[in-house]
Structure formats: structure tokens, C-alpha cells
């Protein structure tokens, strides 16, 4: 018989739906084959259908309750994730507020009392703010930072004014002829020595802070890499968990189906046992409708195996869920460690180093950059929150799409199984009807048109061909989807490796070395300068070639990967188009199948009506035969005995054939299920081996990465030690050159003093030497009014600007490089 399952919205029946709405009808109507024993009346038929419908409804209610419990667990997990995200947001906000308090405290400790705005709100208050309140709070924070930096700049300006006053006082003392010049020189030397000591101390502290920041940045990158690996592992585990859910749901449906069949078989067996005392004709009709045999041992073993497989799948799903929870806890602990490291980096720098680390000139230049950096960080925080919300929405949409796809595949599989069952049911019903037709033809000489049987055979053949085409199309679509997924995963891995290579590569910008011409003081200095330029030229040439080679390799790799991405995008578009066409064809095929099913239903209804008419005619003939039997009782009794014996023999033969057919069908079904179970077990074993191989490959890559990081650290330490040795040698050489120059000047001065005859000539010579010290050594005409902040050599501003504009950005005395922010004007 046919069972109609109405799952419309609001309890609407299928009869109320319009006849032309095929899509809605296909969604609401579902056919399922159910084997029932023979019945004596219409009421018994209705009662059996109601019982079967109630069993099916119980199955659906069980499945829906399990789905509801799964969705509730997912909701709780999503709530926990939301709480972790909110806690991370509060941690980030608290870090920013502590940074602002630290800046305020530093400005207050160094420069006295500062007018401060009200204290910043807590993280929970910020979480409950509106967008306008949050923007106003950000503006006030920016104003607080601006006031702090203004006060810091004012203090630095006061310090520079004090130094300027000191220099002016020295000028006045130098202009006074009564004062001794040696005392002034001693004061200047002491002041210069103190400043140089302070500068050396600041440089050492800056180097230390930079090295610490570099180490912390490396640790942060390492933690980020670990985090990305764990996220990918979580995604893989989620996919495996979804597959396990799908398999458990499938096995649960099969188990419910087999349990319902067992119940029906037991009911049929009990019904046959109670009806054994009835008439022989009714008993033969019941046996023709259903053999009523209890379930065999093979079917019970199959059901037990399916139940054990279902329990195993549930245990695997529980273990995987526990692993996911463990990884989530590890991620939370890692996030807490990262926040602690950030707090340690912010609190490790002492206040004395911050207060004495920079001068007024550098602070004035970098003030605008600090404000822009703060704004950028605020924008980045907003972008991160927006991106987090977008990722959540994308993930939810993706989960919905995946659930819809799973539902579609389940419906397609159910539809195929229903077609398969209807095919077997129709074949069995056709054989039973053929036997009934032969018996009725022998008794009452009734015939059925051969055209109806031909039409039913044609429909069965069409259903078989449609089933084969649908299976081939489904296999083709699955193969295409697997190929596209493999290509997509390969492209992702290649992009990830390229990004890692770009992050690990170090690009060192090099400046062109310019040839500087200086006056040869003596023969030794000229030879030394020429050798130094030659060595520097050779070193710069090698570095440039290496840099060019690296740039070419990187550009080539990027171009290759971009082309591969374009080709993959095109293939993906082609695959989506093919999938759309296949889905359209599948919908057309489904519509045709539904039309054929409706036609078959109409034919079955007509056949039932014909059978009812035949039964009525049979009853009338029986009454007539009873009236006539009074006249010829003996003859009819003998004839009836002969006929009943022949009928019993035929019925026994038919029962044997039916039992053989049922046994063959059960064996075929068992073979099909066993082959499917073996195939699933093989697939699970292959996937398990693949996951193990991937885990081994991941461990090997991790070992390689650790080894490369250790080698990189060794090379960095070696490079730092060598660079420090080179800088110390360079500094010693510069000091020796300066001492040599001072000795030469003293020697020339002593020589000139010996040659001078009177005291006036001595004073003139001293004045001339003082003018030479105050004039620019490059142009010999203009006074010294500009200082190099790296080497502290004095020149005129015009000479330094011409050197900067002509790209000869090296100090004429020590050949040290300088930039736009490395020279400043002074007043002597």
C-alpha cells in the first residue's frame, strides 16, 4: 500500500495545495513501501494503516527530539564562545587603559602636577556603551594623550632653553678679555663629557630595549603560528564530527526502520496464529497476501550488528567532542599567556629610562607620528571587531548551507530507497495479482485487459532506467566535488607556504654608497681613505646583487601563484555551472517520477474498484449457486471436493514460490547491506590512515621549523656580535683620528707660537685659530650652526642641506650616514 506523509506548514494537507505547484508537492509528499497481510474488511485495513502511521510518527518524534538536544548543545557551545570573545575584548581594552595611565604617570613623575581629565571607565562599562558614547570616549582619550605629550614637549623645550642660556653665558665670558680661556675650555670639556656619557648610556639602553622587543615579537609570531595550526585542527575535527553525526543519524533511522519491521512481522505472526481456526478459503487468501513467517536469524543478526555500529559511532563522536573541548581550553590558556606577555613587555621598561631616553628635538618630530599610530590602533581594533562579527556571520551561513546540503543528500538517498522499495513492491503485487487473476478466471471466467499489464511493465522499466541515470549522475557529481575540494585545499596550502616564506624572509634596504672627496691632510690618511672606500664598494656591490636576486625570485613566485589562482577560479566557475545544470536535470527527472507515481496510484485505485466489483459479483454467484445446489447436492459436493483439492494444491505451490522469492530478496538485501558496511569500514580505515599520515607530516614540519628557528637565532647572535665588534673598531679609529688631529693642531700652534715674536702676534694667532674652530670645515667661509645627531660633528646648515639634496648623505669627517631627522640647527 501507499502511505502519504504530509509535512506541510501549519498542518495543511496535500489535497488543499494547488495541483500545479509541483515543487511544494514534491516537498510535502513522500511515498514508502509497507508490506501488510491480507485483510477481511475495509475497517481492518484502516486500523492497520493507522497503526503503521503511528509507528512512523513515533520514529519521527524520536529523531526530532535527538536533533533538538543536539541543537541545544550547539547553542550552549556558541554561548561559551561568545563569553570568551567578550573576555578577550575586555582584556584588550584594559591593556589600552593601563597604557594611557602609564603615560599620565610618567608625565606627572617627570614634570610635576598635570591637569587630568576624569578617570577612564572600566571594560564592562565600555561593553555597554553605544557607538556615540564609545566615539566620544575615544576622542577624550586622544585629548588626554595630546595634553600629556604637550607637557612632555614643554619640559624638553625648557631644557633646551637652559642649554641655550648656558651657551650664551659662555659667549659672554669668552668676549670678556679679563677671564682666562683655559677655565672656559675646562667647563666645556666637563659638560661635553657628561653629555657623551649620558648619550652612551641611552644608546646602550635603546639597544637592549630593541633586542627585548625583537625577542618578544619572535615569541608572538611563534604563538600566532601555533594558534593558526590549532584553528586548522579544530576545523578538521569539526568536519569529522559533522560526518560522524550524519552517519549516526543514518544508522539511527535504519535501526528505527528495522525495529518497526520486526514489530509488524511479530504482529502478522500472532494474527496468523489466532486466525488458524477460520475457514480454509479465508486462510488461503491470507497466505496468498502474506506468508506471516517470523524474522529469520540473519535479519536479527544484521539488526544487532547495526545497533553495535551505531553505539560505536556515538562513542567516537563523544571522544571527538571531548578532544574539541580540550583544544578550546588550550586555546584559552594560550590567549591568557599572550596577554600576560604583553603586560610584561609594557611593564618591563623602567621609568628612568623612559624619562631620559629622548631629547626635545626627536620628541617634537615624532609627536605627530605617535598620535597617528594611536588612531591607527583604535581603527584596527574597530576593524578587528567588525571582522570578528563578519566571520561569525559567515560561519553561521556556512553551517546553515552545510546542514541544508546534508538534508538534501538525505532526501535524495531516501527518495532512491523509496523508488527501490516501490519497484520491489510493485513487482510482488503484480505477481500476487496475476495469481489471483488466474484463480478468478478459472472460477468465474473473468478477464482483465492485457493493455493495463503492458502499461504497468512500461512504468516499471521507466522507473528502473530513471533510477540508473540518477545513480550515475550522483556519482559524477560526487567525483567532481571531491576533485574541486582537493584542488582548493592544494591552493590553500601553497598560499600558506608562500605567506610563511614572505614572513620569514628579511628584506634589508641598502643605500647607494657615494664617493666623498676630502682634502688629503697627509699621505697616510689619503691611503687609508682610498682603501676604506674600495672595501665599502665591494661589500655594497655583493649586497645589491643578493637583494636583486631575492626580489626577482619573490616576484616570479608571486606571478606564478596569481596565475594558478586565476585558473582555479575559472575551473571553480565551470564546476558551479555544471552543478547547476545537473541540479536542473535532476529536478526535471524528479518531476517525471512524481507524475509516474501519481499515475500508478490512479491505476491502483481503479484496480481496487475492479476487485470490489468482482467480489460483489462473486457473492451474487454464490447465492445463485446455493439456490441451485438444493436440486443437485450430491453432484455438487463431489465437484466441490475435487475443486477444493485442486485449489489447495495450487495454493501450496504458490506459497512455496512466494516463500522462495521472499528468501531470495532477503538474501540480496543482506548481501547489499554487508557490501555497504564493508565499503564504509574501508573508507573509514583509509581516512584514519590519511589523518595519521598528515599528523606525522605535521610533526616533521614542526621539527624542521624548530631547527630553522634555532639556526636563525644562532646566525642573529653571530651577526650581532660581529656588528658590535665592527662598531667598536670604528669608534676606536674615529677617536684615534680625532686625537691625531688635535695633536697636529697643537703641534702647528706650538710651532707658530715659537715663530711669533711679540704678544700681539700670539693673540692674533689665537683669534685666528678660534675663528677656524668656529667656521665650517667643509666650505671654510660660513660659521658652524648645525650639528649631526649621530656623530656630533658641527657644520654649516647650507653645506649639510646641499649634501642632503645631492644625495651625498655622509659626514665629511667620519663618513657616517645621516637622514632627514639626523641633523639640527644650533646657536653658538
Swiss-Prot record:
It catalyses: S-ubiquitinyl-[E2 ubiquitin-conjugating enzyme]-L-cysteine + [acceptor protein]-L-lysine = [E2 ubiquitin-conjugating enzyme]-L-cysteine + N(6)-ubiquitinyl-[acceptor protein]-L-lysine. GO terms for molecular function: ubiquitin conjugating enzyme binding; ubiquitin protein ligase activity; zinc ion binding. Residues 269-298 have a biased composition (Low complexity). One of its GO terms (cellular component) is membrane. A zinc finger (RING-type) spans 776-815. Residues 53-92, 185-251, 311-345, 460-616, 660-756 form a coiled coil. Pathway: Protein modification; protein ubiquitination. E3 ubiquitin-protein ligase that mediates monoubiquitination of 'Lys-117' of histone H2B. H2B 'Lys-117' ubiquitination gives a specific tag for epigenetic transcriptional activation and is also prerequisite for histone H3 'Lys-4' and 'Lys-79' methylation. Involved in regulating stem cell proliferative fate. Interacts with ubc-1. Interacts with mrg-1. This is E3 ubiquitin-protein ligase bre-1. It comes from Caenorhabditis briggsae.
